[in-house]
Amino acid sequence: MQDHSYSFVVDATPPEVWAVFWGHRNHVVEHRVVRIEYLHWGDETGNGRIRHCRFPVPRYLLSGGVGRSWEWLTEVKPHESWRYDSIGKPLWSRATGWIRLEDLGDGRTRVHFRETYEAFNPILRALLERRVHRFISRDNDWYMKSAIERGVRAMREAR
């Protein structure tokens, strides 16, 4: 099993960061090479939200360099945290992730991210799991931070 964590600081309050993830009703969100399609919105807080994601994977997995995951979001605490569980392919796997927002004051938020990842097949787990997860995760912090900053900027400009 792989375990990947990082955190970063953005110049936005927790409610602003929250709104980037939870305040829109777009059915499809694209950020560079990542595409997220929302299939079900969940309850009023977003608990039970279901999404389908498309993202880059190594070409040697013979999927045209495209990975897919189906994710459901739970343990949603508005302006604080949420969890997701997912099933992904082409290296059939499961992942669990946690995102937590820490208010630093002065209009800044530290975003904490952690994900565990495990391939189902024990042979592929031994041969490919670490390499594939490293590839998938290598730019996650940059993608998430830049998406938040872009979203916050757009919300502020729209005011």
What are these regions (language model features)?
Residues 63-64, 92-96, 121-127:
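A short, polar/proline- and glycine-enriched secondary-structure boundary/capping micro-motif
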Residues 5-8, 68-75, 86-88, 95-103, ...:
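Hydrophobic/aromatic beta-strand elements that line small-molecule binding cavities or substrate pockets
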Residues 116-159:
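A conserved amphipathic terminal alpha-helix motif
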Residues 1-46:
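Hydrophobic ligand-binding cavity/cleft-lining segments
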Residues 11-15, 44-46, 74-81, 100-110:
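A short, structured loop/turn motif at beta-sheet edges
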Residues 1-9, 50, 68, 81, ...:
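Intrinsic-disorder/low-complexity, polar/charged segments enriched in Ser/Thr/Lys/Arg/Asp/Glu/Gln
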Residues 26-29, 38-90, 142, 146-159:
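Glycine-rich portal/gate segments that line the openings of hydrophobic small-molecule binding cavities
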